[in-house]
Amino acid sequence: MKQDKMAEVQSHACNQKARVYLETYGCQMNFSDTEIISSILSDAGYAIAESEQVADIIFLNTCAVRENAEQRIRNRLQNLRPLKKQNPKLIVGVLGCMAERLREKLFQEEKIVDLIAGPDAYRTLPNLLDLAESGEKAANVMLSLEETYADINPLRKNGHSAFLAIMRGCDNMCAFCIVPYTRGRERSRPMTSILDELKQLSDEGTREVTLLGQNVNSYYDENSGTRFANLMDKASLVNPNMRIRFTTSHPKDISSELIDVIAERKNLCEFIHLPVQSGSSRMLELMNRGHTREDYLEKIALIKSKIPNCSISTDMISGFCTETEADHAATLSLLREVRYDYAFTFVYSVRPNTPAATRLNDDVPDDVKQRRLSEVIALQQKISAELYRNDIGNTHEVLIEGESKRSSDMWMGRARNNRVVVFPKNGAQVGDFVNVKITDATSATLIGNAL
């Protein structure tokens, strides 16, 4: 699509108040992006719809990190066909990483799609919508070296907790990962804009903020020379009673300075998500992770020595290229040694154009991948159950997030260490901090009573 043609189209959304329904898939960054998209569209005069049934426009904010993530989107597009048939003027758009990966090819493969926009193109959505409303296929998948959306005030629904993106993109080029190709190079927001947004959130009564980035540990504000540990230190001072979390970290970049800051500042939560992907140094080298098993364990030991009550989670890939039974055994032994609170576990799926896709052979049979994944999951569930049972008798400060999915008589919230806690309702409300004494546990949930 030519930029001059986009410029010629005058937005008429303010007059029409078209209704946009947004559906989000994938990581926390995508959910944060949806809040940015909502703000951009709202400022352009569009109304945000609560249901696809009443929408004039349906946007799917997508993930491309694994093949099954993209298949979910394709299935969803198929499900939308009856709505499109019922209302031919309905505009269906695919946003985010899947749009960036497939680009205009998506129009050919999914005829229902009228509009595509990559993660750095959301400011152009009003113009793209004007083109789509005129009957044209509209696309913008240009990546940017500067875009951080730092000046956009996200339209958030959740008043007690918030995502705040501090950087975008990734420069690590892990062999299996498509993120650098769908989200572009690393860019950090200015420190002042982050602190200003934290202050605004604090003034609005937000109780907990999660700082987001593909690799927050490589955050760097060129103007002030601020790195992530210093940013976290300054962020903790905005409101000492507002919890602050962060995700995601790359093991090679997490610093002793950051660990010291978390240990010192009482409102920085004792929880670190530290994806390792494999327990085998041979696999880590093939994956281009930039560290060995021993390097990783040194970081884990440092965290546990400085923050003894810190919970740690991870990501694991089973069946990466050439993985042997010995490599798999090394992953299982790492689980036993680290004792993660939980792990996000996946079988390896080839992502087109990644280094692994072009240079390595996906030679582990599917049944072997699945068997190894099952063994990883079974061991991790056993470890999680042991850790959670050890919490019985302890008391946690819990931020109430909402009703338990299993019972309307129970509240569900999170402890500082990110463990999910459920307890019978009392006089407290969503957004309140409550001290809860733990009386029981499963492998994924703590159960207790409010004090």
Swiss-Prot record:
Chain sites annotated for binding [4Fe-4S] cluster 1: 27, 63, 97
Transmembrane annotation, as ranges: none
Cofactor dependency: [4Fe-4S] cluster
Key word Transmembrane helix present: no
Residue intervals of the MTTase N-terminal domain: 18-134
Catalytic activity: N(6)-dimethylallyladenosine(37) in tRNA + (sulfur carrier)-SH + AH2 + 2 S-adenosyl-L-methionine = 2-methylsulfanyl-N(6)-dimethylallyladenosine(37) in tRNA + (sulfur carrier)-H + 5'-deoxyadenosine + L-methionine + A + S-adenosyl-L-homocysteine + 2 H(+)
PROSITE patterns membership: MTTASE_N, MTTASE_RADICAL, RADICAL_SAM, TRAM
Complex and partners: Monomer.
Record-stated family: Belongs to the methylthiotransferase family. MiaB subfamily.
Protein name in the entry: tRNA-2-methylthio-N(6)-dimethylallyladenosine synthase
